[in-house]
């Protein structure tokens, strides 16, 4: 009995440590395995004829639900979709799917954030500067650690694969796969979302920063209403986007979405870039497609080569972030050029302003973008 109790305490501690539903379910299964004989003895007589098989079936169903989606089509609002060279959907490589299952992105963040000093050498080897690590440490010390986990909780029953593994495989094994996140509209009391409801929806394209197209961001963008959010990625984890990527939004991604059945309002196409992904905003400003965007939004990234553009520009950053320090002056310069400019700037925030101020930023973007679905 003492041995069982010790094992159970260790398993409960492991259950509390893990963040993902997948590993929490496995810990519960192991606890059940330790006490299965005792549990069987506690069952009423009529239930003993079934044994404990129904409980194992229930655990297996829960485990299956906790695994990332492999189906191309699912009822989830947030999905990771693999695309072939023509922009048509395809199943993800099985190896990438299995690694997604066994090493969920949520657990990588959970271990990295909670054990930052242990993970620091690995993070540094990946090119993350000491300033960013120090800022993360400061946020943790200030009680903001939950901000890094809330987006995963916000995904709810949605359980897409992680977008970073396709990029890791491209870098490490020279594969050439491409995957995007699609976040479908939530709809409101006036318009119930469906692909065939007779409405066209705004499209918000998100370009990630360094270290890849994380699932974490989708738990934030899920709260944008009345729009389709498309999170595209660079082939590697660099987050450096070029004019070619801007062209592909119109020649590759939008046609792909429309073949999937999404109805897009081409007058309401918005582009957002985070950190290194701000390179997409600079590229768009100097692209012939600048006129095709309704707004450009740079998050935690000063813009280079400012110029007058025929669309709105939004700047989001923090005063403790060197990557955002120029935003107030840049907003002023753009306004003097005649560009409608929105500024969300918090002097005491750092490079992680998006996770720390996600609700305020979402409300700011809703106001600036004025996302509305229109009848076809």
Language-model regions, residue ranges each:
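A domain-start/cap signature at the N-terminus of enzymes
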Residues: 12-15, 21-38, 42-198
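C-terminal catalytic histidine-bearing segment of alpha/beta-hydrolase fold enzymes
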Residues: 24-31, 61-69, 112, 122, ...
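Gly/Ser-rich "nucleophile elbow"/oxyanion-hole loop immediately N-terminal to the catalytic nucleophile
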Residues: 193-199, 241-275
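Short beta-strand element of the alpha/beta-hydrolase
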Residues: 198-209
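Short amphipathic alpha-helix adjacent to the substrate-entry channel of hydrolases
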Residues: 215-231
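Primarily recognizes the serine-hydrolase "nucleophile elbow" in alpha/beta-hydrolase
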Residues: 267-309
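Short, proline-enriched alpha-helix->beta-strand connector loops that line the catalytic pocket
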Residues: 308-313, 337-339
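Short beta-strand/loop motif that positions the catalytic acidic residue
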Residues: 314-318
